[in-house]
A protein has these predicted regions:
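Short coil/linker segments at helix-helix boundaries
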Residues: 2-20, 43-74, 94-145, 149-156
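TPR alpha-solenoid repeat register
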Residues: 34-36, 85, 143-145
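Post-signal-peptide N-terminal segment of Sec-exported extracytoplasmic proteins
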Residues: 16-32
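Secondary-structure boundary/capping motif
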Residues: 34, 40, 89, 133-134
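A generic tandem-repeat structural signature
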Residues: 73-77, 85-92
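Alpha-helical tetratricopeptide repeat
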Residues: 1-5, 38, 87
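Short coil turns that delineate tetratricopeptide repeat
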Residues: 28-31, 78-81, 136-140
Length: 156
C-alpha cells in the first residue's frame, strides 16, 4: 500500500495545502506531467480514504476519489510506467468500491440503487483486475495483492 507517513494516524490536508496547490498549478500549465498527476492522486486518496473519512456515504470523499481515479488513469494513459502508480490505482478503485458499501436504501429509489450497484460492481471488477495485474508484475508480493482483493458484494 502507498500512503503518506508523517507520523500521524492520517495526514492533515491543511499541512499539505501548499503542495496540493503547487501540484494543481503545475497540472494547469502542463496537463501531461505524470509525476504531478501521481502525487496529486496520492494526496486525494490520502485525504479521502477510509481512515480520513470513514463514512461510506461521504459525497465529497467520493468526488475527490473520482478525481484521483481520473488522474491515475490519465497518467497510465500517458504511459507512466511505475509500479507505485499501479498500486495507487488499485487502492483508489478499492476505496471507490468502499464508498458504495453503505446500506442507504432509504436515501435512494430503485433506479438509483441499481445505478449504485452497477458502479460498485464496475469498481470492484477493476480493483480486482488491477490487483491481479500487480500480482503478476510483482510476484514476490503476489499473496499480499491477492489478500487486498475485494471479496464482499453490494449490500442491497
Amino acid at each position: 500500500m502507498i500512503y503518506i507517513n508523517d507520523g500521524s494516524f492520517r495526514p492533515d490536508p491543511k499541512k499539505y495545502a501548499v503542495i496540493a496547490d503547487s501540484l494543481d498549478k503545475k497540472l494547469k500549465t502542463d496537463d501531461r506531467d505524470t509525476t504531478s498527476m501521481f502525487y496529486r492522486a496520492l494526496l486525494y486518496l490520502s485525504f479521502n480514504d477510509l481512515k480520513a473519512k470513514p463514512s461510506p456515504g461521504d459525497k465529497v470523499a467520493l468526488e475527490n476519489l473520482v478525481l484521483a481515479r481520473n488522474l491515475a488513469d490519465k497518467a497510465m494513459g500517458l504511459k507512466m510506467t511505475n509500479i507505485k502508480l499501479e498500486v495507487l490505482r488499485a487502492q483508489i478503485y478499492k476505496e471507490l468500491t468502499y464508498r458504495f458499501t453503505s446500506d442507504e436504501a432509504w436515501k435512494y429509489n430503485s433506479k438509483q440503487i441499481a445505478d449504485r450497484k452497477s458502479q460498485f460492481n464496475s469498481y470492484k471488477e477493476l480493483a480486482n483486475k488491477y490487483y491481479d495485474e500487480l500480482a503478476e508484475l510483482d510476484s514476490s508480493n503476489a499473496y499480499d495483492y491477492q489478500k487486498l482483493k475485494i471479496k464482499y458484494n453490494y449490500p442491497l
